[in-house]
Swiss-Prot record:
Signal peptide: none annotated. HAMAP family: AroD (MF_00214). Keywords: Amino-acid biosynthesis, Aromatic amino acid biosynthesis, Lyase, Schiff base. The keyword Lyase applies. The gene is aroD. Belongs to the type-I 3-dehydroquinase family. It comes from Methanococcus maripaludis (strain C7 / ATCC BAA-1331). The keyword RNA-binding does not apply. Its EC number is 4.2.1.10. GO terms for biological process: 3,4-dihydroxybenzoate biosynthetic process; amino acid biosynthetic process; aromatic amino acid family biosynthetic process; chorismate biosynthetic process. It is an enzyme of class 4 (lyase). InterPro entries: 3-dehydroquinate_DH_AS, Aldolase_TIM, DHquinase_I, Type-I_3-dehydroquinase. This is 3-dehydroquinate dehydratase.
Amino acid sequence: MICIPVIDENVCDAINSAKEALKYGDIVEFRVDLLKDVTFEDIEEFSKVPSIITIRAEWEGGNWKKSDNERIELLKHAIKNNAKFVDIELKEERNLELVKYRNESNSNTKIIISYHDFEKTPEIDELIEVVEKELKIGDIAKFATFAHSKEDTLKILNLMNKYAGKIIAIGMGESGKLTRILGLDFGSILTFASMEGKASAPGQVDVKKLKEILKLIG
């Protein structure tokens, strides 16, 4: 799957952007933390679209400035409304609460447990430890780390291959672009690509360019 982030500040703009993005991608990621104001009704609308609902905490590089309690309640509402995926951080102390809520409400939502390092790509043993912890909590493990070299890129591709079908792995930055292009072939559930001028992370490839490259490499 190709996932396109929706990074608008206005809810109506976000819904329109999602409709446009789905002409090119398979799924969108609503970055709810970037919206100026969001209601439970908005979450219901987002959940009708093939999407990942992400409300990234400020301490994990996001923009959510309201209470953690409100964030968790919005994510629960997405689960209640059967959003395709919700994303919650490995470092969030209440992530198991969301999994329990999903299980008790018989929701079809898959829970992504995520980890970010915006400075480096840790050693492979440390990354394996992260992924194993994530898979003990949620359905899908996700990590996004900053790649500085070919070695970093190879580490990330190696882990995609090891955990194929239950991982989303990303190398941020220019050196990590190859992880975005080859990710699907190496076992990542999805890869992120952006609409023109709307990247949500360093090194994100324009979706039209990505599709051209994927077509070329077969």
